[in-house]
């Protein structure tokens, strides 16, 4: 069975850009983010449905970190099969690191390379060939390799 801890990692390429996405996965992912997210709608994440996006502010105690979009995926209907929160923030390296370091301090740990996909495999969200195809898709450098990897992922429909 997958580790019981909560993992975090940058889901977008490292470096500066317009936005960055930080992914958090684990049974308590939603609970770790909720106290630090001020939704524009004033709803707490714990009361929100799966597969929803919420505009708001991420804070670090009394200090605001960034205006963000938080996307919520509840287990088992997520990529990993666990509760997943994706934080879309402004893409400066400073903001990315501030958010990562903050949640590491809240008990998350940095995900190892491929660990989100490993958890998906261990939760029966995909088979081994599909998990390997995800790595191939990420590494694809041309249309042919992209299409081949994509076809391998969808040979059998995943259980989402």
Regions found by a protein language model. Give the residues of each.
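Residue-level detector of conserved catalytic or cofactor/ligand-binding positions
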Residues: 151-160
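A glycine-rich (often HGG/GG-containing) alpha/beta subdomain
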Residues: 1-147, 151-152
């Amino acid at each position: 069975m997958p580790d019981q801890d909560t993992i975090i990692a940058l889901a977008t390429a490292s470096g500066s850009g317009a936005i960055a996405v930080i992914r958090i996965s684990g049974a308590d992912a939603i609970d770790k983010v909720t106290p630090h997210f001020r939704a524009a709608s004033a709803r707490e994440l714990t009361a929100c449905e799966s597969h929803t996006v919420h505009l708001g502010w991420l804070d670090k105690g009394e200090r605001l970190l960034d205006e963000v979009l938080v996307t919520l995926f509840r287990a088992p209907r997520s990529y990993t099969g666990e509760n997943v929160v994706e934080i879309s923030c402004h893409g400066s390296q400073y903001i990315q690191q501030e958010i990562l370091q903050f949640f590491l301090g809240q008990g998350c740990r940095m995900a190892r390379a491929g660990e989100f996909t490993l958890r998906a495999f261990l939760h029966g969200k995909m088979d081994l060939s599909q998990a390997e195809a995800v790595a191939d898709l990420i590494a694809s450098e041309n249309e042919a390799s992209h299409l081949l990897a994509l076809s391998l992922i969808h040979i059998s429909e995943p259980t989402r």
